[in-house]
């Protein structure tokens, strides 16, 4: 599988979940393992440019696929507008839900560059934030939309490099 533009080849135990592969095998701990029931959305990553809850995907199912985690959002040392929006507009408190929220927001902006607050809330409806109201999260996504948020990041990835 290719994760954040780096190709990895590993043998995995057949029941290993993608979230555990990313965190335990690759050391990519930005994605969080939350509810273990596919309800909270803290584990959202992209698989072939679609948001998926990585606690519901076997690592083996990602073979030959492209995976994007929150660590892969920044480019050339610059934060993605979604990441910057969450920081500037106080879209997080504890931060546990934030990686999944950011990846879902990035997908939304890539497909709807100027979403309404209702569209933002609908896109994020599969994710739970227990700390904040969603007002600052919506503001964060709106900020990103106004600052080159729909930059097509998902469709313009560089060629993957090889890793062990």
Predicted regions and their residues:
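Signature of N-terminal electron-transfer/Fe-S-associated modules in redox systems
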Residues: 1-164
